């Protein structure tokens, strides 16, 4: 009887902990969104980010580090908050997202605003280009409703800009979302791609990587 009670108490404690982490993350994100950014402070913080994402925010064409330049401020804030709340698995980023590095909500706002104003990458890494018509069809059917016809996303809905992103990074994230490795993935997106094989995801990623920049 005592064992059952103990297990139940542990379970309750774990559930309470998870909800507390999620609430903290949400509060931090909302607080950051309501602050006035300090671009100069954001630029200083970004010097550390540039180690991997480069000074221009264009990452690496092999997809090991994504393009972040020009991404919506809201999306950047959410992803950073998710990563440091461990709601998105990214061990490489963990050391760079702590309060001691970025700061609190104000730090998130500052660096996110700075990154959002960097010019977008005009030439991201691309796939083989063999199935672009099929990729366009799939994109229009599965992706356009949220990400827009030009892949520009929706800042208010936290839908990321995907135009100008590296093919290899896009493909990896699609696979991770499908396979349940992205804990912070949008459930609606998971439902759309959960039955897709790697080839289909690659075709979509290749098309997206080639969407021309909006004029």
PLM regions with names:
Residues 1-10:
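Bacterial N-terminal signal peptides that target proteins for export
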Residues 9-18:
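Bacterial N-terminal signal peptides
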Residues 23-46, 59-64, 113-138:
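Electrostatic cytochrome c docking/interface patches
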Residues 32, 39, 58-88, 94-99, ...:
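Gly/Gly-Pro-rich "capping" loops immediately C-terminal to redox-active cysteine motifs
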Residues 37, 44, 55, 140, ...:
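His/Met- and acidic-residue-enriched segments that coordinate or traffic transition-metal cofactors
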Residues 42, 49-55, 111, 142-149, ...:
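The canonical Cys-X-X-Cys-His
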Residues 61-67, 83-110, 115-118, 123-127, ...:
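Axial heme c-ligation environment in periplasmic c-type cytochrome domains
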